[in-house]
Amino acid sequence: METGKSDVLDKIEKINKKDSALQEIIPKGYEIEHHQCGIALNQLIPSKKEGEPDKKVFITSTIPQITERFEDIESNEVSFNMLFYDNKTPVNIAVSAEEISDSRQLLKLVNKKLDVTSSTSTKLVDYINASKRYNPPLNVKVATRLGHVKGYFIYPYQEVMKDSNVKLFSNDKGFQKLIDSFRSKGTLQGYSKKVFAQIKDLPMVMVMLYASLGSVLLREFGLQPFIVEISGSTSTGKTFTLNLVSSVWGTSDLITTWSSTQNSIESMASFLNSFPMFKDDTRNTHPKFVTSATYNFSSGESKSRSNINLTLNAKKEWRNILISTGESSIANMADEKAGVSARVVTLQDQPYPDNFDFTTLDKSFRENYGTLGLAFIKQYESKKDVYKNAFESYQRYFNQKGSNEIMQRLGRAFALLQVTGEVLNDIDGFEHDHFKIIEQAYDSMVKNNKTIDKPKQLLEEILQYLDANRNNIVGDGYSSVKNGDIKAIYKRDYLCILGETVKEKLTHELQTITGQWDKKGYLIKGEKDRLQKQVKHQTVKYRGFAIRQEVLKELGFDFSNSYNPNSNY
């Protein structure tokens, strides 16, 4: 495994400047031999006869030294940095304890330039461990992921972590690419004047910016992960916005597409941990995958999986925000719409005004990035108790404001976004009306997102189905059903949707949804306060859910047959 370009290598670079193979103490029974082609490590086998020289057995021409011992502060697992020289060029490899203890594992490092064969691997393992005892490696505490880890906050920025007792360590090339994308250019003042000033009055864009910044606060306020998405038709600036809001932490290389596997999303969420995950364009994968990934991500932990030892792997955990784009909202992709809706803040209004200058703003945030995120964390730390009290106040406000169960469950998410806006507003040069921003975004979501009120949405869907199948309706003004079953009975004061029709549409959610219909006052109930009403038609008694006429009108439906010239209705 190759070490990543993380800050832990700072200490290694000091050793790289020296010929460590000559500096270290060579264990008894070994020697380093210099020759015209380089150097060689030999094992010395004492002669059995007096006067005969000791026998030399060649081991390797790339003499390894274990320079660092890395101890993961979460798992307590130990790994090492192995240093050797290949044609006078230093090579650092991150190796597990198993790889330097098992000759078969060590042999795999031949692909990393280590001079080892099947006949020398056992001897080389013995030398490495003997050398490690003679030359104890430097102990380094490391974290293998970002954000809140065991009482530390692990930054992806090398300059911030240089004085920390814990170093960031990654030997995964994919994660290393993410680490490299967390970098800065320009100044905070430049970002304020050239980027923030252009977007501070755009509610949809600002809420996405709040989500990007506020992700690092989820553990601070005890929130589960959630999703913030901007959805709508093409060419409205969705991907542009994602690039923009990622700039508070680094470059647009932080963004990946939805064309991923469940495992890769879990791994990335766990690695980023507290920092936001950016996913572009839900069209890149199947809707069922998106909804499944949404449920899994918002749980904050990976699925339980067994291993070859028939035990369970340790679960990966995270507390961050997933920021997404797509033409269709994630909630609309789901069969269980209410469950998804309570996990997703959906922004559907036009994010930018007509004739907006995208070109200038694009140039600005590509020349100024990676500064605001650090300033945000610093500002939060300076008044942490004040912001925590503000969060509690905002949470109470949104709980009271929530007009239904979904918006009440999203109240904590909006409270976090609101306090994020407050922290941002307290940074010099980033003053703006954060209350107005959140208020507009909240009201927009209530207005545009029909999946928020699931009972109402499902009733609308059933009514649309009946409207398209009026030949299966009987009652006042209707003729008899000639083909198929009766699905509803129309009366002047209500439309009675037969129980079987509702059961067919609502399946296992029948009791929950019809109970909500009752609470909302949609139903004319039957005898003994039963939800289903008995309705008589042509001497036959039917049972069903009687939807009030005023509710039908409110939802835009007219099931009267007044358009029929032969009808009195």
Residue ranges and their predicted role:
Residues 140-198, 386-569:
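DNA transaction DNA-binding modules
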Residues 281, 319-329, 348-350:
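A short beta-strand-to-loop transition that corresponds to the Sensor-1 phosphate-sensing loop
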Residues 307-324, 340:
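AAA+/SF3 P-loop NTPase mechanochemical coupling elements
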Residues 241-290:
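AAA+/P-loop NTPase substrate/partner-engagement loops
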Residues 2-199, 267-268, 272-275:
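Conserved glycine-centered beta->alpha loop in an early N-terminal alpha/beta scaffold
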Residues 316-318, 334-427:
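Phosphate-sensing "switch" segment of ASCE/P-loop ATPases
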Residues 291-305:
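Conserved catalytic/switch belt of AAA+ P-loop NTPases
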Residues 165-251:
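P-loop NTPase catalytic core of nucleic-acid-dependent motor ATPases
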